Amino acid sequence: MTRSLKKGPFVDHHLVAKADKAVTNKDKKPIKTWSRRSMILPEFIGLTIAVHNGKQHVPVYITDQMVGHKLGEFALTRTFKGHPADKKVVRK
């Protein structure tokens, strides 16, 4: 279910403030955030945001195709190791 258009996009205020500061200072360091729920705005294009996945911060470089998506979509929280292989006995 998508968010209502009359509400507009949700972005944490501290993330917007950090992004504006990075743009004005032309800072290339990643911006650390735990806000996976924040939507990517056009002002974030070209920035690297380190999104927390529950264990570590995953660096995400923001491109124009990511605008409108949420930050959490690009930092996976679960690791899939694959299904266990069949352990069949090989007789010689």
UniProtKB/Swiss-Prot annotation:
GO terms for cellular component: cytoplasm; small ribosomal subunit. The keyword RNA-binding applies. Keywords: Ribonucleoprotein, Ribosomal protein, RNA-binding, rRNA-binding. One of its GO terms (biological process) is ribosomal small subunit assembly. It comes from the Bacteria. One of its GO terms (molecular function) is structural constituent of ribosome. The keyword Phosphoprotein does not apply. Belongs to the universal ribosomal protein uS19 family. Protein S19 forms a complex with S13 that binds strongly to the 16S ribosomal RNA. HAMAP family: Ribosomal_uS19. This is Small ribosomal subunit protein uS19. The lineage of its organism: Bacteria, Pseudomonadati, Pseudomonadota, Betaproteobacteria, Burkholderiales.
